[in-house]
Amino acid sequence: MLDATTAGGWTPLDVATLKPSLMSLSPHRFHGPKGVGVLYKRRGVSLVPLIHGGNQEFGLRAGTENVASIVGAGKAFELMSGILDERIENACKLQTFLLREIKTKIPSTGIIGPAPGKDRLSNQLNIVFEGVEGEALMLMTNVRGLDCHTGISCVNRHMESNRIPEATGLPDDLFRSSLLLSWHEEHTMADLRGAVEIIAACVGKLREMSPVWNNLQCGRMPSRLSLLPETVKSS
């Protein structure tokens, strides 16, 4: 099973090359309707029906189809296939600009994952702001009009994080000090510059109140940013 819900619309996905048994896509990632998903199933792969009954959707989900959403998803795929390269190119420029702005204006930051390039999606950055609690930063920036969320977006009702920190080999606290920012091809550098101004002001205010930041500045705690690649950190 290949989960391509985030990658769809932001990187070429060729099932002949990838050879997945199953692949999921989310059309709202490329301006399709929300609430509809797409599942690619390789020929010969058998699935148990999600809802038993009628033979709708190849017998996998009984009930009347959501025709409007299906048509909307198909149209989104059609439109995106013609502009994918241009969309990725524009998003890459915004990504490089955003990272440069953050490294210039906010000290002690870094990104989780590879530097911008072929090994990273072009429409997002997971940014660590050392000495800051990510949820507090998210709430403060949201109030000021910036739509973002914490670096760990999938948590259960007990606020236990998902397995991403374990998979990356990075400590959980780096993720808990991060924001995940994303954008699309219609955003501008002015939009991103405004976002950085909001984040910088909020980070500064939170660090003024942070005992962790104070300990880092006084040398009583080692910086965890040393675990990130040098190319993605600011001093």
Residue ranges and their predicted role:
Residues 1-235:
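Pyridoxal 5′-phosphate
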